[in-house]
Structure formats: C-alpha cells, structure tokens
Amino acid sequence: MTYDFDLIVIGAGSGGVRASRISAGHGARVAVIEESRPGGTCVIRGCVPKKLLMYGSAFSAEAADAAGFGWQVAVDGHDWPELIDAKNRELDRLEGIYRSLLTNAGVELIEGRGLIAGPHEVAVGERHLTAERILVATGGWPQIPEVPGLAEHGITSNEALDLAARPDRVLVYGAGYIAVEFASIFNGFGAETHLVYRADLPLRGFDDDIREESAVALAGRGIILHPGCTLTGVTAQADGLKAVGLSDGTEIVVDQVMAATGRLPNTAGLGLKTVGITLGPKGEIPVDANSRSEVDSIFAVGDVTDRVALTPVAIAEGHAFADSVFGGRPRQVTHANIPSAVFTQPPIASVGLTEDGARSQYGEVAVFISRFNAMKNTISGRSEKTLMKLIVDTASDRVVGAHMLGPDAGEIMQGIGVAIIAGATKADFDATIGIHPTAAEEFVTMRTPRS
C-alpha cells in the first residue's frame, strides 16, 4: 500500500519533535500535527517558563542575603507584567526555533487537532492523511481533583504561568514537584503562600530525608504548610477573592487557588479506543520497550505513556524510536537511574534509588549523609541547611543513590548521575579529589556511614 507519509507524529512537543527530526534525517517522509504551539509542555507551558519565573522569584532572597555581605539592596516592588512579557518573548523565540528545526529537517508541520481514524490514518479537520506508522506524543495535562468549586474558581500550572497580576495571597493544593515549585515561586515574589497536601510530607517518591528537610526549608522561607489536609470546597467572594475550606476546618481567603495534584496522559479524544488500543487506568497508552502499542503501526513516547514523565526521557524515547524504526539501529531507553531536579528554593536533585528502595532491592546498604550550613549562609545569616546523601550497596560497594537539597543541586547532580550510570563505587568517590571550597566536594569526602 502507498501512504502519504512514512510517519505521522501527533504532538510537536519535545519527544514528538525529536522523533520527527531524527526520522526525517534517516530518510523518512514525516508530518507532525500540532493543535497548539510547537514546543509542547516543556517549552510553552512547563519547564522553561516555570524556571524563568523561578529565576525571577529568587532575587528577593538574594537581596536579603546581600545585607550580610555589606550591600544595602532595597526591593521596592516588582513589575509582574514586564516579567510575563519578557517570558513570552522568550517562548516566542523558542517556538520559532522549534518551527525552524522541523522545516530544516524536511518535516511537514500541520496545524490542527489530529484524530486517529485507523491504524494508518489520521484526520485533521477535513483532511485525511495516511502513514505506515503513527507516533502519539501528546504529553500530559493537569488534572483538577473533584473538589466543589475548584474547577470553576481555581487555576492549574497552565494559567499560573500567565496571570495578569501577581497574587498577594495564594493557596497551592498538592505536594509534588509542580506544587512545591510554584509555592516557591509565589513565595519568592512576596505572596502569602499556603501549601496544602494530604500526606505528612511533600514530594512523595523522593528520599525521606530529603522530604523532611524540604518541609523545613519551605517553612523556613515563609511558606505556610498544611500537611494532612485536603480541600473541602472553593467559593468565590464578591470582591473577587476565593474562600478555600480545608478538611481541618480552616478557611483561607486568597487571590488564587492552584490545583497541582498531578498530571494525566493527554489521550482524550484521540480515537485510540476505536482502533483497538486499550488505555491504562490513568488514560495512558501501554507500550512495550520499543514504544510500540498493541496496534503494530501505532507507537507512543513521552508523558502520554506514563512511564517517566520528564522532558529528557521523552526526547530519549523519541530518538530511540527514530533510530530503531528508520535508522537501522535498534535500541531501547532504560528508565533506571534517571536524574531529576525540583526547582524550589533551595533546589532538590536526585538520581538512583531512595534509601528505602535500595534496602528493598539490595538488602544491606550503607548510608552516608551530611547536613551543613552552606558557606554563603554563614555570612548572610540564613539558617537553611544543605543536605547530601549517598546510598551504597554494601556487597558491591556501588553507589546506587544520590540525593541533595541545597544551592545548585540540579547542576551538581547531573555529574553524579554519570558516575552512577557508569557503576562507580564508593571507593571511586573516595579516590576523587574535591574542588574546594564547594558544596559538591561533600559528595567525595563523606567517610563515615550513618549507624
């Protein structure tokens, strides 16, 4: 059978664009369909704009810290619209780069919503296209929990990036990385910030020592924590404020209430069920190690598969798909030991197993932990601690987990990730000369395991 394309990709986010470009580079005829803006979640409404706001929010603390070093820095106010305009200009620039990457690779960009009409057919409005293979890369979308009034009066991360005005009082509902990052952002811009979550500690899935220290750090920055609570309802007041009820009986009045309790695969209305794909419990597309669905001609990468919802993972999966299917170089992406970071203030980073996970997998482990004042804080007067932790499989001496809370955690952890992927032992860490004075040198100078 003759097809219009060798590959149709639905979704021009990070994973879809990488798969499109590499496939075209291998000689495939490729079209990518996008209903919004090329760049997807990360570039348009996720990692990039969020980190730009995080950078902006950090200056208030920097100004406060400067006093200990002899600087008298007055923070008289902040021009929120100017920041949003600057952020939008950068997103426009990045979107243009994504469009150019597709054009230069020979990929046809089709704007509209793609609907899978058959194992080899995608409809975009009145246009019907055929391809030997279809790749779904539509990402994820914020979920809003079923709380009376929350959907009507609340916002998600999508809207939080484009608020017309900086809120003076905000409540963030959730305790995952998105929730704590936005709580840090709003707090840094001077908003009275409440963080409400069901568990005892934020950041479920991270190492417990990091979770405990993060709660201390968030509270130390002035964020008001409400652990063990859920929302019971949100009502709008005549003055435009929102009254938010908590399960402990508290009522909090805020300018904005943000739902950040998780994201779900963006599969609704794609026509997947009609072609024989049974979605998972979260709406995800189940795929094998080669990103192939139960329909042989349909593949999926990125957040839509609910494997590891991180942009670099989607990019790696898209690249591996293209090399395997069109490049004659079959390979798979391993989802173990993926470094990650949480861009709170202070930031958090992790790679490998948590202490509990390591004990479950290896049995006997040695844990090395250091909690100290960063050098800058000794003069700034900030009481915030830096926490570093290594987890070692006792039998092999391999370092199987590394965790950090403190300045530059993400930058430091990227290098530690290479060591763990390479199978470095604790002896290798011990034999490495540290760079002094840095916080990072602590990872190669911890000698005594925790009893």
Annotate each predicted stretch with a short phrase.
Residues 8-15, 19-36, 41, 48, ...:
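Flexible, glycine-rich terminal cap/loop adjacent to redox cofactors
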Residues 1-13, 166-176:
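Beta1/beta-strand and adjacent pyrophosphate-binding region of the FAD-binding site
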Residues 11-14, 35-36, 173-176, 206, ...:
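Glycine-rich Rossmann-fold phosphate-binding loop(s) that bind the pyrophosphate
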Residues 150-167, 251-327:
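FAD-site-proximal beta/loop scaffold in flavoenzymes
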Residues 47, 138-198, 224, 273-275, ...:
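Glycine-rich dinucleotide-binding loop and its adjacent helix/turn
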Residues 2-5, 21-28, 33-166, 199-203, ...:
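Glycine-rich flavin
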Residues 74, 108-111, 115-123, 189-289, ...:
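A Rossmann-like FAD-binding core segment of flavoenzymes
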Residues 8-10, 114, 129-139, 172-173, ...:
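Short hydrophobic core segments
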